[in-house]
Amino acid sequence: MMIEKENKNIAFVDGQNLYMNTAKKDIDPWKIELGRFRIYLEKKYNVDRAYYHLGYTDKKYQDLYEKIQKAGFIIVFKQHSEAMVGLKKGNVDSDIIFSAMKRLYKKEDFGKIILVSGDGDYKMLVDFLIEENKFEKILFPDRKFASSLYQKLGSEYFDYLENNHIKEKIELKKKRAP
């Protein structure tokens, strides 16, 4: 008797959206400990591969890139022409959408997709993935900045990273003074 292997899920993280809506927000900022976040994605959502999309490379952020990779994420940088590097914001939405659709088109062997962003630009992708039974969950970094386009999405398809039951598992713990 052959045991069927459970398909592993894939996560796509919009790195700028995650950072801007947690650590960089004006009210009650908090930092995610990337290693704990990666483990959370694996344990809670059976994520085998987690792609962390960033806007562009800059040597001054090399330490950050190493932290992201050490935590178990696969970094994907947005392609820019040499003249535009450093002048554009991240805007990785189309890259994430294309990557997800390419995997579907090529019939890549995976379970479902988990998306980490509050950006409304992913709404059509989310709707299509639900229709194709290939969508697990969208994790909004911040309730206040989650796009209103997702309001009609059933609660089984989303959660907020700032919710206490998630935040306590992934938040960077502040070191206590000696």
Predicted ranges, named:
Residues 33-37, 95-100, 121:
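Well-ordered alpha-helical segments embedded in enzymatic catalytic cores
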Residues 106-135, 139-141:
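Acidic, metal-binding active-site segment of PIN/NYN-like and related structure-specific nucleases
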